[in-house]
Every structure is written in structure tokens, then in C-alpha cells.
Amino acid sequence: MNKKKKIFILGVTGQDGSFMAKLMLEKKHIVYGLVRKSSTGNLSNIKELIHKKNFFIQHGDLLDFASLERIIRKIKPDEIYNFADQDHVRWSFDIPFYSFNVTANAVIKILEIIKNYSPESKFFQPYSSNMFGNSINKKQDELEKFSPLSIYALGKTTAYYACQMYKEVYGLKIYGAIFYNHESEIRPEEYVTRKITKSVARIFYGK
């Protein structure tokens, strides 16, 4: 019989976080989801999960390091998924310090908390294809040279190297993946690719 794991998902109200929460609940695990107090009215992506017995909302903020430490120390999660992000490249030029804090400094703080209080936890950190900048190659992997051209991409690149360092120096169980644009029916229409896919769907259905 598979062990029932404790899963902590940062950014649980977003596209990726909510899908991960649903998957983990289907696997009969216990899911804790980080939700900002300011986001209490934006729970549409997890409304069907809120009353499930193995789903627990944890109030905190990616930049409120005390709340992250409190939650991780209390839960001692088996797995941590960091889907919380400021993922608008354009916005990162307008709010550079905030963007870098969210995409880079917060990740380092999470790694420090894991190292000090929950070293057996597995940690998953998503990266971004924006780290490659204007790469001329049609396909990229970790061997491709990083060339960040935005604060958002710079933060993701910093997070990548921080995760590599904590994995090699401290032996933490850190995993990652480089994300490219990916769509679903719940992705906000403020994203260009979502606008495109929704327009295609309207054309297909003759609307």
C-alpha cells in the first residue's frame, strides 16, 4: 500500500498549482495549499477542493518568510511544489525588485528553511524558457547557455543556480523542470497565448 504523503503546494490557486493539488488528492495524499490572505476571494480554481477532508489551506505569502517557516516546520511535508510566481515578463520591468524577490530570493529562503527544518522534504522548482533569452536554437535543454533578458528571467536563472548549489552542497532533494508556455481552460486570458487559443476555439465553434 502506498504511503499517504504530505504535500505542500505554493501557488495552489494558480493553473499549475490547482492541477497538482487535484492530482495529489486523487492519489489519496494530504495536500496543504499556500494562499495569500489577499487571495481569499480568488479561489475559483480550487473551489471543488476546499471541502475535501485531505485538503488544507495555509495562509501566508511567498515573501512572508516567517509564515513559510512556520508552515514548513509544522507540516514537515514529504514534497513541496513551488508554483507561486510573478510570471508576467512585462510586469517584471515595471516592478523589478518585487519580481526578483518573488522569483529568486523567495526560492533561496525556501531552500534555507528546508535545509534547517525539513531536510528530508523533496522540493520541486519550475524554471522558465525565458532564461534562454533570444536563443537561435529551436530546442533547448540545461546545456543551452542562459541569457536572461528580463528581471523575471534573471530571477528564474538565479533560482536555477541556487537550487543546483543547495542540491550539491547540502544534499537536498531538489528537482526542477524548465516550463514553456502551456495552456488550459483555467489560464487567465491576460496571457497572449491564452488569448490565441481561446480565439481559435471560438472560430472552431463558429462563435
Model-derived segments and spans:
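N-terminal Rossmann-like NAD(P)+-binding domain of SDR-like oxidoreductases, especially those catalyzing
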Residues: 1-184, 205
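A glycine/serine/threonine-rich, flexible loop-to-helix segment
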Residues: 138, 189-197
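Alpha-helical substrate-binding/gating segment
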Residues: 168, 194-207
